[in-house]
């Protein structure tokens, strides 16, 4: 399901104008990328706040409507107030369906509770990273990537290159090369734990 974001062009710019916007329940933002000039926008704070709480909003191609004109974008940055539950600014990047995009996609960890390491060995699952950098065409962007921990023994880990990625999705070059561990089953306290194997060269 496509996620729609409603915005309007922001005519007044600068610190004072942004402060007044926030007092009025709006959030300043910008849309950039592609062959079109950057556009300053404003969005409803409450709608944006709730959208940002959803995982899919951060790893989906969004339909941004600016004064009724729609374009496909990715959320690239959201700045939050240091101690208030307030969004201060957002950045969106335009995407082209014919050009690959580079996105951080969240990981969903499955079946740890039925793994030999947990069920038989009494181990504790540990998630080392919660997202990975991938590249794909916009139409192939997954909301998340599954990490099946069901076969893990105590002390064993799953690495990035072990994951089954959706069709059309690949890890970016540096992640492929580094092949980081993404999850491990730690030995129970007092037990002997193997050191996770280093990724193959």
From Swiss-Prot:
GO MF annotation: an example: 5S rRNA binding
Highest taxon of source: Bacteria
Matching Gene3D superfamilies: Ribosomal protein L25, beta domain, Ribosomal Protein L25, Chain P
GO cellular component: cytosolic large ribosomal subunit
Alphabetized InterPro entries for the sequence: Rbsml_bL25/Gln-tRNA_synth_N, Ribosomal_bL25/Gln-tRNA_synth, Ribosomal_bL25_b-dom, Ribosomal_bL25_C, Ribosomal_bL25_long, Ribosomal_bL25_short, Ribosomal_L25_dom, Ribosomal_uL5_bac-type
A Pfam match: Ribosomal_L25p
Record's keyword terms, sorted: Ribonucleoprotein, Ribosomal protein, RNA-binding, rRNA-binding
Biological processes annotated in GO: translation
Cytoplasm listed as a keyword: no
Entry-linked HAMAP family: Ribosomal_bL25, Ribosomal_bL25_CTC
Job description of the protein: This is one of the proteins that binds to the 5S RNA in the ribosome where it forms part of the central protuberance.
Subunit text: Part of the 50S ribosomal subunit; part of the 5S rRNA/L5/L18/L25 subcomplex. Contacts the 5S rRNA. Binds to the 5S rRNA independently of L5 and L18.
Family, as annotated: Belongs to the bacterial ribosomal protein bL25 family. CTC subfamily.
Protein name per Swiss-Prot or TrEMBL: Large ribosomal subunit protein bL25
Source organism: Thiobacillus denitrificans (strain ATCC 25259 / T1)
Source taxonomy: Bacteria, Pseudomonadati, Pseudomonadota, Betaproteobacteria, Nitrosomonadales
């Amino acid at each position: 399901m496509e996620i729609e974001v409603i915005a309007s062009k922001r005519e007044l710019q600068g610190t004072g104008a942004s402060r007044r916007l926030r007092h009025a329940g709006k959030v300043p933002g910008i849309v950039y990328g592609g062959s079109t000039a950057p556009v300053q926008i404003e969005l409803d704070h409450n709608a944006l706040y709730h959208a940002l709480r959803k995982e899919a909003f951060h790893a989906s191609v969004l339909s941004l409507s600016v004064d009724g004109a729609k374009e496909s974008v990715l959320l690239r940055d959201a700045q939050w107030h240091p101690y208030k539950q307030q969004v201060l600014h957002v950045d969106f990047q335009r995407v082209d369906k014919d050009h690959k995009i580079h996105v951080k996609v969240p990981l969903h960890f499955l079946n740890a509770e039925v793994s030999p390491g947990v069920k038989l060995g009494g181990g504790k699952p540990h998630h080392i990273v919660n997202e990975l950098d991938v590249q794909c065409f916009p139409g192939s962007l997954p909301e998340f990537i599954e990490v099946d921990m069901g076969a893990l023994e105590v002390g064993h880990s799953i690495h990035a290159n072990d994951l089954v990625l959706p069709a059309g999705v690949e890890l970016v070059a540096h992640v492929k090369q580094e092949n980081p561990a993404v999850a491990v089953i730690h030995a129970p306290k007092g037990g002997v734990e193997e050191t996770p194997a280093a990724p193959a060269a």
